[in-house]
Swiss-Prot record:
Source lineage: Bacteria, Pseudomonadati, Pseudomonadota, Gammaproteobacteria, Enterobacterales
Record carries keyword Endoplasmic reticulum: no
Keyword hit for Cytoplasm: yes
Species the sequence originates in: Klebsiella pneumoniae subsp. pneumoniae (strain ATCC 700721 / MGH 78578)
UniProt-recorded name of the protein: Autoinducer-2 kinase
Catalysed reactions, semicolon-separated: (S)-4,5-dihydroxypentane-2,3-dione + ATP = (2S)-2-hydroxy-3,4-dioxopentyl phosphate + ADP + H(+)
Top-level taxon: Bacteria
CC per GO annotation: cytoplasm
Keywords: Cytoplasm, Kinase, Transferase
Disulfide bonds: none
PANTHER family: AUTOINDUCER-2 KINASE, SUGAR KINASE
HAMAP family, A to Z: LsrK
């Protein structure tokens, strides 16, 4: 049989995942990695090129061993990664510097760039690329020009982290639109670099690598890479892409108007746009999809999964111990407890992530509002359900913003990622949005989407879109409860009002924002999000 290998470089770990041509996962090799903080450089998060390549090779060998396959059984390889992370190379093609996705060292440079063109530069960048300056590559390049001119002068090429992995395997440098689009330097409409943006920023525009679409052949595994990784020299290496967009491919979300909520550490609400366009209010990010010619509106709920982990670890030691004794997941036990709490969680309002406002992106101080001292009504089960309801409310607010500028009317949504493992959470998401929610069998779909790209580039599949639709299968579908939907609409309106007041406390310096975008020096009150 033929098998495909996906290298999936996440924020916290690297995975090598092997699939057969029917999309069945055979084996995975995984290793955690850590990013490097540079002394006296606040917000820095450098990517350890040497150690992380060793870990990638370790994972490939581990996956091959676990699957009991030889290197000759792997017919094609593709790589995907977290977006925004960039790698710079010298003129010999050697990587000389890299940073991870949320490296925030360039706050001052973000603020400087916002001032050029009579304070219109960020709007001009967004109109062309769908990105703001907060996590784009240009402020980071400007920081290097200011503080590490030795690196900046040597830099001859820039790629994303997924492309670095592919280059380590094949010796070929190129970027794909889905991942390179997050640099803020790629034209959303032409799916090619926009050098004029770098010119306007006073940056060099001579380091832009070739652009190749996801699912096209890049090269082949070199002899050196074969010795290091355990793969066979000559194995095709295919262009991969950004993790979220490839995740959508793995979920079969490949047609205009289709919608997905990806529930991980962050929650992304992703909508395939009928035509390429940006949001006049600059609330929503717009990225190239891996499907050629298609763009995705993407909103982000901050730290949703991390908030649930914090709640579990800080307050639920007893439940964790019981779950361990029963051989079940602690979240499953907490969900079972929360299912006995009535919809609305007795009015408790969690204040964590705001709806997305890409241009003025910050959040209130974390808190719970409207608690009761009645232990029958306000307890761990109540707070856990309230957190699940709030995550769904923020998702619904974000989807409403996307619908407002795009004109897309949602018919259903796909719910995937770790959050979708909870049946209660899936039902709450359906109730809050008023939409049928489908949960796939393969919930961690990014690696599968990457494998589909690998197979397409090697000629094993006809095309990515039809293959994504064919390989996805559904675990369960949830339909909305009309009575709960009405209650949640009222809760959403109240939450938006309360959240705006909580932002006011941050603005006045009385509380500390959970997170704010780099370069956001002067916060301005943002109008409340539209209701779905």
């Amino acid at each position: 049989m033929s098998y495909l290998l996906a290298l999936d470089a996440g924020t916290g770990s690297i995975r090598a995942v092997i699939f057969d041509l029917n999309g069945r996962q055979l084996a995975v090799g995984q290793a955690e990695w850590k990013h490097l903080s540079v002394d006296n450089v606040p917000g820095s998060m450098e990517f350890d090129l040497t150690t992380n390549w060793q870990l990638a090779c370790q994972c490939i060998r581990q996956a091959l061993d676990a699957a009991r396959l030889s290197a000759a059984d792997i017919q094609s390889v593709a790589c995907c990664s977290m977006r925004e992370g960039i790698v710079l190379y010298d003129r010999n093609g050697e990587a000389i510097w890299a940073c991870a996705n949320v490296d925030a060292r360039a706050s001052r440079e973000v603020a400087e760039l916002k001032e050029i063109h009579d304070f219109r530069f960020e709007s001009e960048v967004y109109e062309v690329s769908g990105q703001t300056l907060a996590l784009s590559a240009m402020p980071r390049l400007l920081w290097l020009a200011h503080h590490r001119p030795d690196i900046y002068r040597k830099a001859a090429t820039i790629t994303m982290i997924s492309d670095w992995l592919a280059a380590k395997l094949s010796g070929e440098l190129a970027v794909d639109p889905s991942n390179a689009g997050t640099t803020g330097m790629l034209d959303l409409f032409s799916r090619d670099w926009r050098p004029a943006l770098l010119d306007m920023a006073g940056l060099r525009a001579d380091m832009l690598s070739p652009v190749k679409e996801t699912g096209t052949l890049l090269g082949a595994v070199t002899e050196a890479a074969a010795q290091q990784s355990g793969l066979r020299a000559g194995t095709p290496v295919v262009m991969g892409g950004g993790d979220v967009q490839l995740g959508c491919l793995g979920l079969g979300v490949v047609r205009a108007g289709q919608t997905a909520v990806l529930g991980g550490t962050f929650w992304q609400q992703v909508v395939n746009l009928p035509q390429v366009r940006t949001d006049p209010q600059m609330n929503i990010r717009v990225n190239p999809h891996v499907i050629p010619g298609m763009a995705q509106a993407e909103s982000i709920s901050f730290f949703t999964g991390l908030t649930m982990r914090w709640f579990r670890d800080a307050f639920c030691a007893e439940e964790k111990l019981i779950a361990e004794r029963l051989g079940v997941d602690a979240y499953s036990l907490l969900e079972e407890m929360a299912s006995r709490v009535p919809a609305g969680s007795h009015g408790v309002m969690p204040i964590f992530s705001d709806a997305m406002h890409f241009k003025q992106w910050y959040h209130a101080a974390p808190s719970f509002i409207n608690l009761s001292i009645d232990p029958e009504k306000c307890n761990k089960a109540t707070l856990f359900r309230a957190l699940e309801e709030n995550a769904a409310i923020v998702s619904a607010c974000n989807l409403a913003q996307i619908s407002q500028f795009s004109g897309v009317t949602f018919e259903s949504l796909v719910f995937a990622g770790g959050g979708s493992k909870g049946a209660l959470w899936s039902q709450i998401l359906s109730d809050v949005t008023g939409l049928p929610v489908r949960v796939p069998v393969v919930r961690e779909a990014t690696a599968l989407g990457c494998a589909i790209a690998a197979g397409t580039g090697a000629g094993l599949y006809d095309d990515m879109a039809s293959t994504g639709e064919r390989l996805v299968s559904w675990h369960r579908e949830f339909t909305p409860n009309p009575q709960h939907r009405e209650l949640y609409q009222e809760m959403m309106s109240k939450w938006q009002t309360v959240y705006a007041d909580q932002l006011g406390l941050v603005d006045s310096g009385l509380t500390t924002s959970m997170w704010q975008a780099p370069g956001l020096e002067r916060r301005q009150r943002v109008a409340s999000s539209p209701s779905p």
